[in-house]
Swiss-Prot record:
<feature type="repeat" description="CXXCXGXG motif">
    <location>
        <begin position="165"/>
        <end position="172"/>
    </location>
</feature>
<dbReference type="GO" id="GO:0051085">
    <property type="term" value="P:chaperone cofactor-dependent protein refolding"/>
</dbReference>
<keyword id="KW-0963">Cytoplasm</keyword>
<dbReference type="GO" id="GO:0042026">
    <property type="term" value="P:protein refolding"/>
</dbReference>
<feature type="binding site">
    <location>
        <position position="187"/>
    </location>
    <ligand>
        <name>Zn(2+) 2</name>
    </ligand>
</feature>
<dbReference type="GO" id="GO:0008270">
    <property type="term" value="F:zinc ion binding"/>
</dbReference>
<dbReference type="Pfam" id="PF01556">
    <property type="entry name" value="DnaJ_C"/>
</dbReference>
<feature type="binding site">
    <location>
        <position position="165"/>
    </location>
    <ligand>
        <name>Zn(2+) 2</name>
    </ligand>
</feature>
<feature type="binding site">
    <location>
        <position position="190"/>
    </location>
    <ligand>
        <name>Zn(2+) 2</name>
    </ligand>
</feature>
<dbReference type="InterPro" id="IPR002939">
    <property type="entry name" value="DnaJ_C"/>
</dbReference>
<keyword id="KW-0143">Chaperone</keyword>
<keyword id="KW-0862">Zinc</keyword>
<dbReference type="InterPro" id="IPR008971">
    <property type="entry name" value="HSP40/DnaJ_pept-bd"/>
</dbReference>
<feature type="repeat" description="CXXCXGXG motif">
    <location>
        <begin position="148"/>
        <end position="155"/>
    </location>
</feature>
<feature type="domain" description="J">
    <location>
        <begin position="5"/>
        <end position="70"/>
    </location>
</feature>
<keyword id="KW-0479">Metal-binding</keyword>
<dbReference type="InterPro" id="IPR012724">
    <property type="entry name" value="DnaJ"/>
</dbReference>
Length: 374
């Protein structure tokens, strides 16, 4: 086609970098593209010359031969000979712009079905508070996709096999024009597979996959909380065409407990004591995740006061460290008193005015005895 100097055609120096050559070619190709210059043979000629020049200068081997021997160094060596027709130029243009912009172009070829990773699966698991606190092993029943044993995964009925898609010629892609670009899109007939199944397998309906139910043992670590996700690699759906399987995500939901309330890895309980116990102090027994433990309530304990028992909470995930048990004391006020109890309380009230400590303490003990606390 052109015998003009290729560097002159693109408007770059002879020592221009590959990136500079790409940028300049892109600029010229957009400027002189026939869609932007209808009925302009001069622009079409410039477009073709730019494509020919870029075809040589982008290739290190062709460029080296051109730099040394000029156009003569390209004769019979796949470069500098021009393009047979306009389709060659546009295909070349699409190839280059696909390379420049990172999208698939009309020259892209699919080499048969591509490996596809399997889909990830989600399983919502509800467990008891005790299971979350101590950890447990549970068995999940999950849907499972397996290769059809009738067609060995081909999807074709016995005695038949998949055929090359006639619509795309087995490429899995067809060309479509968008403006002055030609891009490649998946073939609508074979859905990008490059092949079709004329007679589908009756067992799997042509999918090559069967649905089954499987059982999977899952270890629940101690300390999990609602919303925690357990990832089981490779336990999702199988991949297609040799692709890797997906993962299984077990999303945990922990049921509420009647005794314990959760605050992170700490546990909270409310323990009721009489006002005599609160006033004089006492030793009480409180529940834990294991056996009950003894807690000393000091004299003068107020309702709502919280006592902390260290390492009696929930374990941190992946650690031996545990949270604490918080015991919130609630002081009960008696609602039904005997006559003697009322008299003692009135005596207590009188003594409270002057606060003679020993006498108050003595009456308080009497009240406790009258109420069956001692």
């Amino acid at each position: 086609m052109s015998q003009r100097d290729y560097y002159e055609v693109l408007g770059v120096a002879r020592d221009a970098s590959e990136d500079e050559i790409k940028r300049q070619y892109r600029k010229l190709a957009l400027q002189y593209h026939p869609d932007r210059n209808p009925d302009n043979p001069e622009a079409e000629q410039m477009f073709k010359e730019a494509a020919e020049a870029y075809d040589v200068l982008r290739d290190a081997d062709k460029r080296a031969r051109y730099d040394r021997f000029g156009h003569a160094g390209l004769n019979g060596n796949g470069g500098g000979h021009g393009f047979a027709n306009a389709d060659d130029v546009f295909a070349h243009f699409s190839d280059i712009f696909g390379d420049l912009f990172g999208f698939a172009t009309g020259s892209s070829r699919m080499r048969g079905p591509r490996p596809q990773a399997g889909a990830d699966l989600r399983y919502n698991l509800s467990i008891s508070f005790r299971q979350a606190a101590k950890g447990d092993e549970v068995t999940l029943r999950l849907p499972k996709k397996v290769t059809c044993d009738e067609c060995n995964g081909s999807g074709a009925a016995a005695g038949t096999k998949p055929e090359t898609c006639r619509h795309c010629g087995g490429n899995g892609q067809i060309r479509q024009s968008q403006g002055f670009f030609q891009i490649a899109v998946p073939c609508p007939v074979c859905r990008g597979e490059g092949q079709v199944i004329p007679t589908p397998c009756p067992k799997c309906k042509g999918s090559g996959i069967l649905q089954q139910v499987r059982e999977l043992a899952v270890r629940i670590p101690a300390g999990v909380d609602t919303g925690n996700r357990l990832r089981l690699r490779g336990e999702g759906e199988p991949g297609l065409h040799g692709g890797p399987p997906g993962d299984l995500y077990v999303v945990v939901s922990v049921e509420q407990d009647k005794t314990f309330r959760r605050q992170g890895q700490d546990l909270v309980i409310t323990h009721e004591v009489s006002f005599v116990q609160a006033a004089l102090g006492d030793r009480i027994e409180v529940p834990t995740l294991d056996d009950p433990v003894t807690l000393d309530i000091p004299k003068g304990t107020q309702s709502g006061e919280v006592f902390r028992l260290t390492d009696q909470g929930l374990p941190y995930l992946g650690h031996h460290q545990k949270g604490d048990l918080l015991v919130e004391v609630r002081v009960l006020t008696p609602v039904s008193l005997t006559k003697k109890q009322e008299e003692l309380l009135r005596e207590f009230a009188k003594l409270e005015e002057g606060k003679p400590f020993e006498k108050v303490k003595k009456v308080a003990r009497k009240i406790g005895k009258a109420m069956g606390m001692e």
